[in-house]
Amino acid sequence: MSVFAVVPVKELRGAKSRLGAVLDPVGRAGLTLHMLRRVVPALRGAGLRRVLVVSPDPAVLEEARLLGAAGLRQEGFGLNAALEEGRRRALEEGAGALLALPADLPLIEPADVAALLEVAGEGPCAVISPDDARSGTNALLLRPPGALPFSFGPGSFGVHLQAALRRGVRVRVCERPNVAFDLDSPEDLARLEASGGVQYRPRRA
């Protein structure tokens, strides 16, 4: 199975705005790149053939290339638009399956990615990995790549489940603590730092 990954990343100057109370813009940009340096190696370490990082930011695309991923300049606006652009490129390059996930998963490891692939089994399917609150979607594996529309955002776990049921797509839920934890708020950052799970020490606001 030729599995491609698509990782959307916002422009650095606007990244992680919810952390503005505790991190200055340089700190937020640095944290975003730090997490990308975790996500891409996790994907490559699990043996994915191709990793596409989609972003409007040239600095992000350059970092992606340094990590061994392909950089795709985002033309549209928003998370789901970035994922659609990545899906189109993946299909052009012959992807048999697509793994979509955000870049703000600071604990993800190759074993987590491998678990998603294992749960998929054989044949057409959708594997959904929710966030801690079981509200959002933190990873979505689709085989074939066009099996479902992308609906990432608040409440997307349920939206993706319902879309799979409506379309008759076999669906599996894969809950992994390292995938469920995404870094969005000051509380998330404090939790991560307290756990010792991040070595990066960003500049404070």
UniProtKB/Swiss-Prot annotation:
Q: Does the keyword GTP-binding belong to this entry?
A: yes
Q: What keyword terms does UniProt attach to this protein?
A: GTP-binding, Nucleotide-binding, Nucleotidyltransferase, Transferase
Named from the GO MF annotations, one term is: GTP binding
Query: What SUPFAM superfamilies has UniProt attached to this entry?
Result: Nucleotide-diphospho-sugar transferases
Q: Which domain of life is it from?
A: Bacteria
Cite the Gene3D superfamilies for this sequence.
Answer: Spore Coat Polysaccharide Biosynthesis Protein SpsA, Chain A
What's its top-level EC category? transferase
Q: Name one GO biological process term.
A: F420-0 metabolic process
Residues annotated for phosphoenolpyruvate binding in this entry: 137, 153, 156
Catalyzes what?
phosphoenolpyruvate + GTP + H(+) = enolpyruvoyl-2-diphospho-5'-guanosine + diphosphate
The keyword Acyltransferase is annotated on this UniProt entry: no
User: Which pairs of Cys residues are joined through disulfide bonds in the record?
Assistant: none
Family assignment from sequence similarity: Belongs to the CofC family.
Job description of the protein: Guanylyltransferase that catalyzes the activation of phosphoenolpyruvate (PEP) as enolpyruvoyl-2-diphospho-5'-guanosine, via the condensation of PEP with GTP. It is involved in the biosynthesis of coenzyme F420, a hydride carrier cofactor.
Q: State the name under which the record lists this protein.
A: Phosphoenolpyruvate guanylyltransferase
Q: Which organism is it from?
A: Rubrobacter xylanophilus (strain DSM 9941 / JCM 11954 / NBRC 16129 / PRD-1)
Q: What is the lineage of its organism?
A: Bacteria, Bacillati, Actinomycetota, Rubrobacteria, Rubrobacterales
